[in-house]
Curated annotation (Swiss-Prot):
Taxon lineage: Eukaryota, Metazoa, Chordata, Craniata, Vertebrata
Protein name, UniProt field: CAMPATH-1 antigen
Chief location: membrane
Membrane disposition: Lipid-anchor; GPI-anchor
Residues making up the propeptide: 36-60
Subcellular localization(s) per the UniProt record: Cell membrane
Protein purpose: May play a role in carrying and orienting carbohydrate, as well as having a more specific role.
Keywords: Cell membrane, Glycoprotein, GPI-anchor, Lipoprotein, Membrane, Signal
Glycosylation sites: 27, 39
Chain ranges passing through the membrane: none
Source species: Macaca fascicularis (Crab-eating macaque)
Residues with lipid group (GPI-anchor amidated serine): 35
Length: 60
């Protein structure tokens, strides 16, 4: 049961990171949109937080 919850948490956090960074959304970029580096830094931060939470739950 613990492994199933870990897998469910991992999948949901990865989907959340993809939605947040716009990987799954099909939005067209305009000239006034922020650069890709700012978008990637937000995704990198969310990935780090998700990874830390996953390890805390898995090793507890």
């Amino acid at each position: 049961m613990k492994r199933f919850l870990f897998l469910l948490l991992t999948i949901s956090l990865l989907v959340m990171v993809q939605i947040q960074t716009g990987v799954t959304s099909q939005n067209a970029t305009s000239q006034s949109s922020p650069s890709a580096s700012s978008n990637l830094s937000g995704g990198g931060f969310l990935f780090f937080v998700a990874n830390a939470i996953i390890h805390l739950f898995y090793f507890s």
